[in-house]
Swiss-Prot record:
Top-level lineage group: Bacteria
Transmembrane segments: 158-178, 191-211, 269-289, 295-315, 387-407
Domain ABC transmembrane type-1 residue range list: 154-436
Membership in a protein family: Belongs to the ABC transporter superfamily. Protein-1 exporter (TC 3.A.1.109) family.
Molecular functions per Gene Ontology: ABC-type oligopeptide transporter activity; ATP binding; ATP hydrolysis activity; peptidase activity
Source species taxonomy: Bacteria, Pseudomonadati, Pseudomonadota, Gammaproteobacteria, Enterobacterales
Organism: Proteus vulgaris
ABC transporter domain location: 468-703
Swiss-Prot/TrEMBL keywords: ATP-binding, Cell membrane, Cytolysis, Hemolysis, Hydrolase, Membrane, Nucleotide-binding, Transmembrane, Transmembrane helix, Transport
Protein name in UniProt: Alpha-hemolysin translocation ATP-binding protein HlyB
Amino acid sequence: MDFHHKNNYGLYALEILAQYHNISINPEEIKHKFDINGVGLDLTSWLLAAKSLELKVKAVKKTIERLNFIYLPALVWREDGHHFILTKVNKESNRYLIYDLEQRNPRVLEQAEFEDLYQGNIILITSRSSVIGKLAKFDFTWFIPAVIKYRKIFIETLIVSVFLQLFALITPLFFQVVMDKVLVHRGFSTLNIITIALAVVAIFEITLSGLRTYIFTHSTSRIDVELGAKLFRHLLALPISYFESRRVGDTVARVRELDQIRNFLTGQALTSILDLLFSFIFFAVMWYYSPKLTLVILFSLPCYATWSIFISPILRRRLDDKFARNADNQSFLVESVTAINTIKAMAVSPQMTNIWDKQLAGYVAAGFKVTVLATIGQQGIQLIQKAVMIINLWLGAHLVISGDLSIGQLIAFNMLAGQIVAPVIRLAQLWQDFQQVGISVTRLGDVLNYPTESYQGKLTLPEINGDISFRNIRFRYKPDAPIILNNINLNIKQGEIIGIVGRSGSGKSTLTKLIQRFYIPENGQVLIDGHDLALADPNWLRRQVGVVLQDNVLLNRSIIDNIALADPGMPVEKVIHAAKLAGAHDFISELREGYNTIVGEQGAGLSGGQRQRIAIARALVNNPKILIFDEATSALDYESEHVIMRNMHKICQGRTVIIIAHRLSTVKNADRIIVMEKGQIIEQGKHKELLSDPESLYHYLHQLQSD
């Protein structure tokens, strides 16, 4: 079981797996350190090399059935050296997604195919950050540290609960005395004393109950604030791939699950649990009164639990269905509001309404099923309660008639039994809330358990110069997706103006996303000033890279706030200078509120050209050393474009500029033009050089635009 093979896929596998965990790797350095004999990495050398990269690795034997429970991706190795990476197991369809190291492509294998390839040997791989992330996984255990943090408050709540239970114990005893002593002996003085005592107990009980609710709600509200803050910070720290692979409405629906958790934390469920914990005291007193009646109460508790357990899985499935339909509705609503101009322009409101009606009907039906099942569950609990009450009444009356129990004792017993049964019934009736909050925690965990962009230990430098290098880049968005960039080698010098052109889908925008470190390449390195971006702090990098897209989003704030978004305390003069460079100052000055004009949601109060010029000013205001125009002028009218192109010399001065454009006139003055086709660079040179070759793609595209 070694990696000796004439093609030696071990080193390549290590490169792929390291980059998956956002760890930079220099294959030549690894080969020099660990491939001492020059014949490839054996298993021991491979494990040592992986550990040197701060990866946690372990070679184990696993049956195919156990592969459902391991952390993926993992490296499957074979005796013949044809190792492959296992990236996903679909246990429902019995399919396996692997990365073929020989073909350098993902493959989907059926069960039989996988069984033929798999020999039971696998290397489990995780990064230290992954392990920390798993330990900090968001589920119900997340609240344990919060409880420990506020343990003083919870101890105070516990002490108050003890006193409340004691008061609850005293009241039935007073009633027993009244029934058995006061009424029989006509003891008015005793009655007055007991009445005063009951009034004092009632006042203290109400006060302590209110105090407990206040303390408990105060502490749970602080936990709620912490969770809400953590959620928003985590959401903004997620990689761009998370948002691109999910619908906006689905993400919003998951975030809104925080409301369910909040309601559960601040509701009566947890205080009911505290009340239930003290039930053993009541059981002791009740047993003293009547073991037979106590046994009836004891036997009823498993009935409550059994009924709740029976209902739970059905209720959970229906709640899952309700959530999924709600997420669909959220997504459709967000999509419809966002695309309202298109919907109205195409007069498709009736069709959209029909879709909404069907989805809404499905959601209401799912909600109705949940309500019906919850009602059945609650009525079942009520039925058990009534049955216990009838049995106790019948049996208690027999005991009173036979002289084994006094009337006062029977009344006191029933009051004590109510102190036990009431929280049990409340918990049983709140079981739906518990199921809902369980689903909410799971759904919210999809956001909070998703790994964020790594910042710890990343490279930060005071200021970049602007040299950019792509070395042997191969990239795809998902393991099972087609290759977007393949064998990209490109060097861009500091201060150079580069134009990138090509057909749609050729990989132009993807190239700039790698510069911004939105993604890590599957193979190769992206370097800025000689530093590997896989090791760079994303925030440090993005603060020094200005980006203008074709469709830029402005926030519902003033123009000055939008331009100075990265630094709200920026001097006004700096904002105005950037606006002048972008050709936006003149039209801003003509607005009634000038730079204090609120632009509306997504800049709806401005024209497309005005929004674009503000976006350009926003990109320029921090004086970035690298500036990216991704179809930035394609949506502009010719006058607006002329203003920007007239200032282009000043805009580009002292910066490395990358201009992506379909309109070739935008890039004709670039220092160098890169032509891309199907994820590869096929041509590069100046405008005239590329036009001189009649067989070139650039010449063909230029001819099309000239016509």
